[in-house]
C-alpha cells in the first residue's frame, strides 16, 4: 500500500535537494575556467564554481543522455521509414520570469554543451528578436505589455523554429537591442544547422487556445526536445529586479542612446519607486498570468532561493 500523500503520489516530477542533485554529477569533468564565469553571468546573478559543479554539471550529464537517446531514436525512425532527412537539431527551451537568471543559465549550458566530445555546434537564440517593433506595439496600443505573449510576432518565431527543426541552412532571426529597447532594422543573426539550439525567453512554454475544429495549432514548445523553467518566489524576483534596475540606472541608462536614459538621473528613492511600479504593472502581471502557469510544462525546474542559488531541482518523470 502506498502511504505517500496524494500530492506526492501524483506528482509528475522527481524532486531533488541541491545535495542529492549534486551527487548526480558523477565524474562529469569541469570544462569551464574560473575566468569565464564573469562573461557568462548576467548582471547581479549568482554564478560561481560551486553552482556550476552542483547544478550545471549534473544537468549537462543528464542532457548528454537525452541528446544521445534522441539521436538514436531519430536514426532508427529514419531507417524504419526508409528516408534520408537533413540533420535535425536538438532544441532546448529556457523559460522563467524577468530577472530570474534565464540568460545566465542559457549561456552556461551553451558553454558546457559545446565542450562535450565530440564538440557539437551549440547555438543560442533569445526570443527578444521576435518581439514586434516598438512602432507596431505603439500602433496596437500594447507597448505597456511588451514581453506578454501578444507582443511577439508568433508566426515569425514559429516559422524560424520550423525551419531549424527541418534542418534548413542559414536560417535568420531578427536582432534586438537592449540599448534602444527595439528591433534593429535590417540586422539578422544566422543559425546554420546547429547540433543543439538553446531558445531562451519568458514565454517559450506558453500554450495557445485549443481550436474547436480540431485543427493543429503549433506553439513554440512543440519544437522543444527538452525545457528548463527557472523558478523563484515573487518576493525574490521583485528584489532582484529592483536591484538590477538601480544598477542599470548607473550604467547602461547613462548612455544617451538608451531608451531608458530618462531614468539615469533618478535618486535611489525615485528609481526604486519607478522599478516597483514597472514590476507591478508589467512584469508581475506577466508572471502571474502568462509565465508561472507554464511551469508545469517544463522537463526540468530549477528552484532558486533568495540569494540566487538553486536550492532544488525537479525532473519530469518519463
Curated annotation (Swiss-Prot):
Localization of this protein: Cytoplasm
GO cellular component labels: cytoplasm
Top-rank EC class of the record's enzyme: transferase
Reactions catalysed: (R)-pantothenate + ATP = (R)-4'-phosphopantothenate + ADP + H(+)
GO BP: coenzyme A biosynthetic process
Top-level taxon: Bacteria
Record keywords: ATP-binding, Coenzyme A biosynthesis, Cytoplasm, Kinase, Nucleotide-binding, Transferase
SUPFAM superfamilies: P-loop containing nucleoside triphosphate hydrolases
A GO MF label: ATP binding
Keyword ATP-binding: yes
Pathway linked to the protein: Cofactor biosynthesis; coenzyme A biosynthesis; CoA from (R)-pantothenate: step 1/5
Family assignment from sequence similarity: Belongs to the prokaryotic pantothenate kinase family.
HAMAP family: Pantothen_kinase_1 (MF_00215)
Name of the protein in its database record: Pantothenate kinase
Taxonomic lineage of the native organism: Bacteria, Pseudomonadati, Pseudomonadota, Alphaproteobacteria, Hyphomicrobiales
Gene name as annotated: coaA
